[in-house]
């Protein structure tokens, strides 16, 4: 199945709770596009850095993300949201969903792959969110902090 045949997933009203929703791209087996980091899997934050220094208490510590990929498409399921995007540099195919912090504020985010880095640029905000591989680990740079994540298993596994 191709990415074009799989409907775009959206965060349910109010966000999802409890068990992770079923994977979105499970039936898609197209190879990743050139320049895409392989982020597929279920990941857990094990370290948070602020200004290069480890922070021992942070809301992101221990959090879990499921990342699915197929061709230029990425879904990130975490914290009650499902962000489904094509990494083609357009608003139309980027994340058009709700923010994680309240599960109701609409967001539009342009997604790209740039030299093996997944880059998210929220429309109207001067920030970038990045994900890239560092050996076996995944790095996630958000506003004000950077996280190291370890892979718990394939994207098909049910976290928890």
Language model: regions and residue ranges:
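Short, exposed beta-strand-loop hairpins at the edges of beta-sheets
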Residues: 137-144
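A structural detector for short beta-strand units
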Residues: 63-65, 81-83, 107-109, 126-130, ...
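Amphipathic/hydrophobic helical signal segments and adjacent flexible N-terminal regions
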Residues: 1-73, 154-160
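Beta-strand-connecting loop/turn residues
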Residues: 70-74, 116-118, 136-137
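Short, basic/low-complexity N-terminal boundary segments at the transition from targeting/disordered tails
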Residues: 39-54, 86-94, 99, 107-118
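Acidic, glycine-rich flexible loop segments
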Residues: 105-129, 133
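N-terminal glycine/threonine-rich, aromatic-flanked beta-hairpin/loop signature
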Residues: 5, 54-104, 143
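Surface loops and adjacent helix of pleckstrin homology
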Residues: 48, 79-81, 88, 123-124, ...
């Amino acid at each position: 199945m191709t990415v074009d045949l799989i409907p775009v997933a959206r965060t349910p009203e109010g966000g999802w709770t409890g068990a992770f929703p079923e994977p979105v791209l499970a039936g898609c087996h197209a190879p990743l596009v050139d320049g895409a980091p392989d982020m597929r899997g279920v990941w857990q934050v094990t370290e948070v850095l602020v200004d290069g220094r480890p922070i021992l208490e942070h809301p992101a510590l221990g959090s879990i993300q499921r990342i699915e990929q197929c061709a230029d498409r990425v879904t990130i399921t975490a914290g009650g949201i499902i962000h489904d995007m094509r990494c083609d540099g357009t608003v139309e195919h980027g994340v058009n969903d709700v923010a994680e912090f309240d599960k109701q504020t609409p967001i539009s985010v342009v997604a790209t792959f740039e030299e093996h880095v997944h880059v998210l640029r929220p429309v109207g905000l001067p920030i970038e969110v990045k994900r890239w591989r560092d050996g076996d680990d995944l790095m996630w740079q958000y506003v004000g902090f950077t996280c190291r994540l370890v892979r718990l298993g394939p994207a098909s596994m049910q976290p928890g």
